[in-house]
Amino acid sequence: MARAIWSGALTFGLVNIPVKLYTAVHQKEVRFHMLHDADGARIQLRRFCSTEEKEVPYEHIVKGYEVSPGRYVTVTREELEAFDPKATRTVEIHDFVELSEIDPAFFEASYYLVPDRSAAKAYRLLGDAMRKAGKVAIATAVLRTRESLCCVRPAAGGALALSTMNRADEIDSPGSLELPEAGEPSSRELQMAEQLVASLSGPFEPERYPDLRRERVLELIERKAEGQAIEAPAAEPAGAEVVSLADALSASLAAARRRGDEHEAPARGERRHAAAAAARTTGRPRAARASRKKRG
C-alpha cells in the first residue's frame, strides 16, 4: 500500500475517527531534465544576486512582497511562522451540503481517507449517512503548514475521499468575462444541437480518454534510446471550413451517427452469434424429441 502523507482524526460532531490520508492522484506527465546541448551535462539553477552578480547562500535569502514596481516589503521566516495555523491533526467537519451546489472550479487535489481498524464502524457510518442523505461534508484541516478548506465525500468501494478546495475569493466569477453578444439560435439549430448532445451521451468511462501525447512521447523516447532514426510526422491536412452553424451541426450529427453504426455493428454481430449458438444448443434436443414422437 502507498505511504500515508498525513495522519490525524476526522471529527463528526463528537465522533472522532482516526484516519490516514493517501494521495488519490499520481500524475504521469513525462518529465525532462535540462541539459547542455554541447556535452549533455545537467544544467544547475543557482540563486544569483542581480546587483552583486554572485551566488547567494540560502540562509541569506528572505521573502519579499512587491507593493509597487521595484519596491518590496521583506518578511522573515519567523514572522511567517507566527501566523502558521496550529497543527490540530484533525479534519473538522462543519457543514453538509449538496455536491451539485459546489462549482468544480473549487476543487484542487484529491486524497483518500483510511480509518484505523478500531474506527472502521464509525467511518462506515459516516459514509453510509452521507450516501443516504445525498450530501458531502465541508471541513477544514491543517495540511503541512496551511489550513485547507476540504470536501469529504463518499467514494467507490465504501471509501471516503477528501478534496482540498479553493477559497471563495480565489474563484473568478464568469460575470467578469467580456462575452460577445450572441444572436438567438433558431429552433432548427437548437433541435440539431440537442440531437447531437443526445447522440454523444453515455456513461462516463475515463479509460476511453488516454493521454495520447504522453504515449507518443514515451514511444519516441524508447525508439531514440534504441538508436532508431526518427522522422518528423507530416502535418495533418486542415479540415474543410464550415461556414454555417447549421451545416456544422448537420455534419456533426452525421459523423455521430456513423460512429454509432460502427459501434453497433460488432454488437449486432455478437448478438447474432449468441442467438445462433443458443439455437444450436436448444434446437437439437427439440428435434430429437420430435423425431422420437414420430417414431412412437
Curated annotation (Swiss-Prot):
Ranges where the record places region Disordered: 254-296
Key words of the record: DNA damage, DNA recombination, DNA repair, DNA-binding
Compositionally biased intervals (Low complexity): 275-285
Keyword hit for Nucleus: no
GO biological process entries: DNA recombination; double-strand break repair via nonhomologous end joining
Residue ranges constituting the Ku domain according to the UniProt record: 11-187
Feature: compositional bias, Basic residues: 286-296
Signal peptide per UniProt: none
InterPro entries per record: Ku70/Ku80_beta-barrel_dom, Prok_Ku, SPOC-like_C_dom_sf
Keyword DNA repair assigned: yes
GO molecular function (one): double-stranded DNA binding
Record field: compositional bias (Basic and acidic residues): 258-273
Family classification: Belongs to the prokaryotic Ku family.
NCBIfam families according to UniProt: Ku_bact
Subunit details: Homodimer. Interacts with LigD.
Cited function: With LigD forms a non-homologous end joining (NHEJ) DNA repair enzyme, which repairs dsDNA breaks with reduced fidelity. Binds linear dsDNA with 5'- and 3'- overhangs but not closed circular dsDNA nor ssDNA. Recruits and stimulates the ligase activity of LigD.
Protein name: Non-homologous end joining protein Ku
UniProt organism field: Anaeromyxobacter sp. (strain K)
